Amino acid sequence: MKNKLIGVWDYTVLITYLGFCSGIAGIIFALVNNPHTNEKWSFIIPLFCLMFCGLCDTFDGVVARTKKGRTKNEKRFGSQIDSLSDMVCFGVLPAVIGFRIGLKQPTWIILLVFYCLMALTRLAWFNVEEIEKEVNEALAAAENQKSRNDNENLEENPALTEEAAATVDPREKRRKFYHGLPVTNVAWIFPLVFCFKPFLGVYFGFLYAAALFVVGVLFVVKFKIKKLNAKQAVPVIILCALIFAGLVTLSVVLQLKW
């Protein structure tokens, strides 16, 4: 059946699809007025969707790499679908949340579009870097193979083969740093920003707008930031979720106005 469909349909992209669905659900919750739901849940639920998207993005690559023998097209598809999903989850969703909380004037609309454009630019450039990285790795592997073939002592020293092969191991080529702020970081940035909402009241929109602008600029400014692995990223997202959930609970108990 899957051979009759375009795309990849196996567990390697399942988490990416799950995160994408969460992002779409968050957008819908933010846009739809439900008369049976308290107003504050119209952005609290989308924020939890945003954090769930962050968790999915943390693990999608880990899960994908568990499948051995993936073709180049499968790997490329995974990379492309991840970026497209990130645009929805970490580009469009935060902007829609901003629209929901009141950033609806023409000036604010320009800001929301600016934020989405910066996210789009960053993700497109990331894809360019990944393609360049793949080409460089292929050239290095070809050069390494040529060196092995030209080495007269290769058969007498099998350890040399292992050492040469290790130099092109993709796991050794994984990036350790990003240039600019990764879009996935908004999974914890904006929920933390929302922690100030009960205390700022009608002025919170200005804080959220400022956060959108600063984060958007950081998407494209060239500075080095360490890449967090799953073990490092998950505690950060969970901690932010707990802080946000605790504040929501506290606001309900104290009847703080959101």
Regions found by a protein language model. Name each.
Residues 13-17, 66-126, 194:
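Multi-pass membrane catalytic core of lipid/isoprenoid biosynthesis enzymes
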Residues 135-258:
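C-terminal membrane-associated helical module and adjoining short loops/tails
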Residues 61-74, 132-137:
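Membrane-helix interface/capping segments
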Residues 57, 116-129, 213-226:
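Transmembrane alpha-helical segments that form the membrane-embedded catalytic/substrate-channel core
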Residues 11, 15-21, 49-52, 88-91, ...:
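Lipid-exposed faces of alpha-helical membrane segments in multi-pass integral membrane proteins
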Residues 6-14, 76-84, 173-180, 228-231:
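Short, amphipathic, aromatic/basic-enriched membrane-interface segments that mark the entry/exit
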Residues 1-61, 218-258:
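Topogenic membrane-insertion module of multi-pass membrane proteins
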Residues 25-47, 88, 94-113, 193-207, ...:
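Helix-coil boundary and interhelical linker segments in multi-pass alpha-helical membrane proteins
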